[in-house]
Design a protein with these regions (language model features):
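Residues forming the flavin
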Residues: 1-23, 30-481
């Protein structure tokens, strides 16, 4: 078993022990944890095969964005097992590629009565730091809010963060992300203006402002007066041979397994990327008892804060700048990787190859905003590399070119969690004020904007400031409609 029994910071509140079957074999897990986590805890890393070449596939993102975890569950194909809750008696099977069930021409006669649209003042999509703060702020302003979250747990990146936050007292400096998430969840539970829907995915934005969602395997239609999109971001990968082997994870997936599910991803890890995420997750891996063999960074210097790098160096972890991955290797799963040094022109230096044995490779090489809903709604989109890719054009209230839609958090540009919370507060406050004047709006708005600008000061915020300025001035690539 690969479950963590002890952690220096976290405690794992496991649900009821249940049994399920994988390929006919009976296994044990805990009710409510993801199917993929339960399989990992039982030593199952290969979840399905690729469609054409039948290559093994394993968990990568662990938040429902990629297709690496698709499996057949209780006979239903293409289930995202990284967000599918485990229940007693589930039947889990591998599948080859994306299953293509036969077209059921009689399905319409079995769908039952069409459901009425559910109306609300504000719909918030995503219950990470931005979405939670947006929902709370809109509800405080008097709006009726539906907050949807495709996973079972609230908090997004916050519940994965065991380190203490920087900033000022207003940004809860000195408080761990997991503790901040608990406080926000309590506020949501106690606010009668907020309906919380977990296990709910936004499927699309349709004509007349209707948002269709899948809630516990049932499709619902929501007609909100305002929509706040706080869908977060997805992790990038690098291109190198065998980058798809089971054991190659996004950094967020490793955090999800360790810090949410209490499951060890493996024994030995190579971390790719020395930004804040790579450095922080490396230290979290050490806390969980995983051996960090090296942190590999292509740039000539680390991109994260020195305070995070210093912790790793004190623990004896080598940080190899001007290095990258040549290739990974392994029979059906990761067994190691060869890295090499780069010259000043980012070209490989012959003879510098190093072979590192590891069963985990953790990719912390950047994030891109999740923006599909903005595209579907016809929002004006811009490509801003400093913000992670395509983002919606916004005014100071976080309002998009479609006046009823707002953006918050990493969906509008990848930043730190503290910034995401503030953009959520601005979006929630503005959406509520659009519907009915909020008492003290100007003072609150100015306060949140001021805090956000303060967080973006200094060398660490230069990239974000540049991206925001480009977006505001239109000095970026337009999305071709």
């Amino acid at each position: 078993m690969n479950r963590m029994e002890q952690h220096p910071i976290l405690t794992f509140d496991k649900g009821r022990k249940v049994t399920f079957t994988f390929e006919g074999k009976t296994l044990e897990g805990y009710e409510g944890e993801s199917v993929a986590a339960a399989l990992h805890a039982n030593g199952v890393r290969v979840l399905h095969e690729s469609e054409v070449k039948h290559r093994p596939r394993g968990l990568f993102c662990a938040i429902g964005n990629c297709s690496s975890c698709l499996m057949k569950v209780d006979g239903v194909p293409n289930v995202r097992t990284c967000v599918e809750p485990l229940r007693e008696g589930l039947r889990v099977e591998r599948q080859e590629g994306h299953a293509h069930p036969k077209l059921d021409v009689e399905i319409e006669s079995r769908l039952g009565e069409r459901r009425n649209l559910i109306e609300t003042d504000v719909l918030v999509v995503g219950a990470g730091p931005a979405g939670m703060c947006a929902a709370i702020e809109a509800a405080k302003g008097g709006a009726k809010v539906i907050l949807v979250e495709r996973g079972q747990k609230l908090g997004g990146q916050l519940v994965k963060q065991t380190h203490k936050f920087f900033g000022s007292e207003k940004q809860q400096a000195g408080t761990r992300g997991v503790t901040i998430a608990e406080g926000l969840e309590k506020e949501i539970a106690e606010n009668p203006n907020i309906q919380l829907w977990v296990n709910t995915s936004a499927l699309g934005y349709y004509a007349n402002g209707i948002v269709m969602v899948e809630r516990d395997h049932q499709v619902e239609g929501i007609l909100p007066k305002r929509v706040i999109v706080a869908t977060g971001a997805f992790e990038k990968n690098l291109v190198f041979p065998n980058n798809d082997l089971p054991g190659v994870y996004g950094a967020g997936a490793v955090q999800t397994l360790m810090n949410l599910e209490g499951v060890l991803p493996g024994k030995d890890v190579i971390m790719i990327g020395a930004g804040n995420i790579g450095l922080i997750v490396s230290y979290q891996l050490l806390q969980a008892g995983v051996n960090v063999k090296a942190v590999v960074e292509a740039a000539p210097r680390i991109g994260g804060y020195e305070v995070h790098a210093a912790k790793l160096r004190r623990a004896g972890v080598p940080i190899l700048t001007s290095h990258t991955v040549s290739y990974a290797y392994g029979e059906g799963k990761l067994e190691g990787a060869v890295i090499h040094q780069l010259d000043e022109k980012w070209q490989p230096i012959p003879g510098t190859e190093k072979d590192i044995k590891a069963d985990i490779m953790c990719m912390a090489v950047g994030l891109s905003p999740l923006v599909e809903l903005f595209f579907q709604a016809g929002c004006e989109m811009k490509f801003v590399p400093e913000l992670g890719g395509y983002v919606p054009a916004l005014d100071d209230c976080r309002r998009t070119s479609v006046g009823t839609i707002y953006a918050a958090g990493d969906a509008s540009g990848v930043e730190e969690a503290s910034s995401a919370m503030l953009t959520g507060k601005i979006a929630g406050l503005s959406a509520a004020n659009d519907l009915a004047a909020v008492d003290g709006f100007e003072e609150k708005f100015a306060d949140y904007r001021g805090q956000l600008q303060m967080l973006r000061q200094g060398p660490g915020g230069a990239k974000i400031r540049s991206g925001v300025e480009k977006l505001k001035e239109g000095k970026c690539v337009d999305y071709a409609k």
